[in-house]
Amino acid sequence: SVGTLKLPDANNVFSKTTYDYEDCNKMLGREGLEKYTLNNISYNKNYRFAFIKVHIDNITEYKDTHGKKAYNTILDIIKETLLKVVEYRGVAGNPDNETEYVVIVKDLYNESELRAFIEYMRSRIIWECKAFDVSFMPLFSIGIGRYPDNGTDFKVITNKLIKATDIAISKGGNRYIIYKEDIHGEL
């Protein structure tokens, strides 16, 4: 969507799209992710967001076997790949620790689009990691919460996102869980 701004006492009018976010080309912290989401919702209450938490299941083992330098390179590859995958559709960040990431993507209107995006994201990360080190096959536990499907409060959706990720990890990892109240319960 586009908003038009006219400054008082000015002859100029300019438009700015809500897709344009000054920090979209870097990893954000918790505050940046929340600010991005709340700003976009204030522009358009009809936005649909997918909150995707990506936990790399086997990254610690990779660090133990390949060392800190290779581990840091893999983390950089994952960050760069997430930013490329998201592009103009949202933002990415790692608010909790260096091995878990949160991606917030707009305008995935149904579950098939969401699943396709997740598979695309996983494939790109695997491809880029294997280009660096063919021996590393990243495994993912992914939790997904959705706005407005899982609520309209940022903290509630974040808690559901965390619960979905915990469920994926507890089931043995290397899977994704889309949080659904009728299956996973209310928080």
Ranges and model annotations:
Residues 2-23, 30-31, 43, 148, ...:
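C-di-GMP signaling machinery
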Residues 50, 96-106, 132-166, 174-181:
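A short glycine-enriched loop-to-beta-strand structural element that forms part of the catalytic core
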Residues 84-89, 122-135, 167:
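Short catalytic/binding micro-motifs of nucleotide second-messenger systems
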